[in-house]
Structures are given as C-alpha cells and as structure tokens.
Amino acid sequence: SFKAYGGEILGVAGIAGSGQKELCETIAGLDRAVSGDIIFKGESIRSLTPRDIIKRGITMSFVPEDRLGMGLVGEMSIIDNVMLKSYQNLPGIMMDRTEGRKVADDIIEKLEVATPSPYHIVKKLSGGNIQKVLLGREINLNPDLLITAYPVRGLDIGASYLIYDILNEQKKKGVGVLFIGED
C-alpha cells in the first residue's frame, strides 16, 4: 500500500519479476487489480478502462518499458506518434499537422532528440532517442500523474541524467511521478 502525491517522485524498486511493471499497468488501467483498490483524487478507478479514465477527466500518462510495443508505433514518424496520442485528449478530432509539428519540434529540442526531422521514422532512432520521444509525448499531455516503467533502462549516462532532469521538472510543476525501477 502506498500514496503518491502531486509534486513528488515516488520510486518503486525491486528485483526482476517482483511485479513493478504489473503495478504500473494496473494503475494505468491496462490490467485489472486482483485485490485492493486504486484511488485517484478521491475516486476509485480500479474497475475503469483507460477510456473510462479519460472520460472522467483523470489525466495520467504511462511511459511503458516496452517502448515500441506499447509505447510508440515504430513505422510512424515522430510527428505522427505525437499526433496519435493527442487524439485521446481531444473530443472527436486529432491535433492538426501544424500543431503536431510544433509539439514534435518542441519535444525534439527540449529532450535533445538526435534526429534529422520530426518526420523521421521512430524505429530508426536509437533506444535513448525513442525513450526521449516517448517521455516527451506523454508529458506534453500535462498529466496529473506520470507513471514511468524503467525510464532509463539501457540508456547512456547523459540520456539518463536528461530523463531524471525532465522528471524533476514535472515534479516542480506539481505532477506526481511514479518511477518504477530496479535500483
């Protein structure tokens, strides 16, 4: 049992196979809790689907461990991945291409993504750059809770520090950050 609050980073660590990833997926509504409850802003979300969570105005973002399986669509460009995610927050319409380009450019600049353009295909990026695009896309949604599963796994030290800095910026903005890791 634990409580996470806005403006703080809560770390959950454990050995491989101890259930951290499942915890993330359950809180994000991607898996069902077997027991217990998940209370978000005073409301139980245990039985809600991700779509129901969005409909209730509950804003949380999930940065999964599997960057190209559950995170980004590898065959699509950076801009298309940014625009695709925006669809869930806009009633019935997608972000237009101009706005998508602006957001993608901001993510590329702020997170120092090494890419020739926002139209670059995601699967051609390095693992660290894919992680930066994924994190940038999620924080662009201005969540109340940002759930991250192993956000620095496999990244070089420079990329890891940048990710830590971005997570600390989110904390300073009042976002609750749930950081799942092994150490």
What are the residue ranges of the model-derived segments?
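Glycine-rich phosphate-binding loops of nucleotide-dependent enzymes
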Residues: 1-183
